[in-house]
Every structure is written in structure tokens, then in C-alpha cells.
């Protein structure tokens, strides 16, 4: 498509740029996954072993097509949503809404900078799904609905997590590398829900692996 629209030379250059973007983004997410696993659940496992295992499984999934890559994505997405909702309910008695005050105390440029980062990093990466569009049999109306619906769901979850963490940790949130895990460790209902952060960590690592697989798939068809 790029070559048909922009010509053979410029189209190839844009294709290379897209492939480089997807590969670089996959590498950054792979680093995040390995760092997260080392900090939380696999502290004794060498980082190289974690990276190799993730890459091999991602390549295996990509080799068998987009359907294999996305089959488990929905399951772990809803698991993550459920964990966020349950923790908000269980930790509601520990939330202090005074932690949100004072409102709008920062300069306007700080809010603009933060908004730019959010729109660029998490939501700017949605461009990768354009590479998967030819594999999805949907009308343009349905595709638009699912596209913006998925983005809206992601925005709601990210906002809910941030509001939950700030309301509980307050100013101390800047002291923690993984404030979400710190908050989840506060959930303690006897021995039934005393280690919910392990479930959260496992689901988050699977979602990162899903993201890496999609990026690898996009880079191979670019």
C-alpha cells in the first residue's frame, strides 16, 4: 500500500521506518517485561533467559498467524480489568480523597506535557493495529466502533489505576518504582486474597507478551 500511494522509493523508506518503529517498540516492551519479572516473581532467573523464552514463544505464535496471537489476549485483558475493579472495591476504605488536593496547582505547561506523553506513548502505539486491519473481516463502521471502543476501555482502566494509586499512596507514590504492586499488597482478606499482586503480575506479563507478539507480527508484514 505504501508503495502504491507514495511510489516505490518513498514507499520502501516509509516501510522500513514503520518496521524499525515496531521492532524498537517490541524491544522496549521486552525490556519492561524482563525488568518487571525480575523485580516481582522471577528474581533469581537471569534476564537473558527471560528474554529468550519470551522471544521464542512470540516467534512461535507469530509463525502460526494472527489468530493464535490474539486468542489469549482477550482472556488476560478481562482478567486485568477484573483485578483493577476488585482492588478498587476492596481498598475503598483505605482511599483518602484529600490526596487529590490541591487541584490544578501545577503550571499549565506541566499538564500539556503530561497529556502529550499519554497521547504519544500508550495511545500513539495503536497505529500498530492498522497493520492487522487487512486480516480482520469487519466493515469500516464496525472497525471504527471497535477501535475507539478499545481505546476508551484502555483509557478508563489507566485512569482508574492512577486514581486508585494516588488516593491510597498520596505523595509517596513517587517513591515507588511499581506503585500498583505496592497498592495490591495492601489487599488482605485472610489467606484467600493475601497475595493478589502475584495474579496481577502474571496477567500483566502475559499482556506484555501479547503486545510484543503483535509488534513482532506487524514488523514481519510491513
Language-model regions, residue ranges each:
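Membrane-interface helix termini and inter-helical loops of multi-pass transporters
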Residues: 32-42, 95-109
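C-terminal hydrophobic structural anchor segments
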Residues: 213-222
Amino acid at each position: 500500500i505504501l508503495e502504491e500511494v507514495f511510489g516505490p522509493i518513498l514507499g520502501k523508506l516509509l516501510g522500513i521506518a514503520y518496521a524499525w518503529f515496531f521492532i524498537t517498540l517490541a524491544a522496549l516492551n521486552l525490556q519492561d517485561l524482563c525488568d518487571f519479572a525480575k523485580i516481582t516473581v522471577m528474581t533469581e532467573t537471569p534476564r537473558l533467559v527471560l528474554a529468550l523464552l519470551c522471544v521464542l514463544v512470540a516467534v512461535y505464535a507469530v509463525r502460526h498467524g494472527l489468530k493464535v496471537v490474539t486468542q489469549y489476549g482477550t482472556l488476560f485483558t478481562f482478567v486485568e480489568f477484573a483485578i483493577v475493579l476488585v482492588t478498587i472495591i476492596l481498598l475503598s476504605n483505605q482511599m483518602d480523597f484529600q490526596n487529590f488536593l490541591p487541584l490544578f496547582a501545577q503550571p499549565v505547561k506541566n499538564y500539556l506535557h503530561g497529556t502529550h506523553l499519554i497521547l504519544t506513548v500508550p495511545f500513539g502505539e495503536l497505529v500498530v493495529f492498522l497493520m492487522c486491519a487487512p486480516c480482520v473481516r469487519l466493515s469500516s463502521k464496525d472497525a471504527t466502533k471497535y477501535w475507539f471502543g478499545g481505546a476508551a476501555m484502555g483509557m478508563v482502566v489507566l485512569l482508574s489505576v492512577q486514581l486508585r494509586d494516588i488516593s491510597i499512596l498520596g505523595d509517596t507514590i513517587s517513591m515507588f518504582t511499581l506503585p500498583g504492586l505496592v497498592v495490591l499488597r495492601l489487599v488482605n482478606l485472610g489467606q484467600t486474597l493475601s497475595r493478589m499482586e502475584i495474579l496481577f503480575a502474571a496477567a500483566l506479563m502475559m499482556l506484555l507478551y501479547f503486545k510484543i507478539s503483535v509488534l513482532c507480527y506487524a514488523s514481519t508484514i510491513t
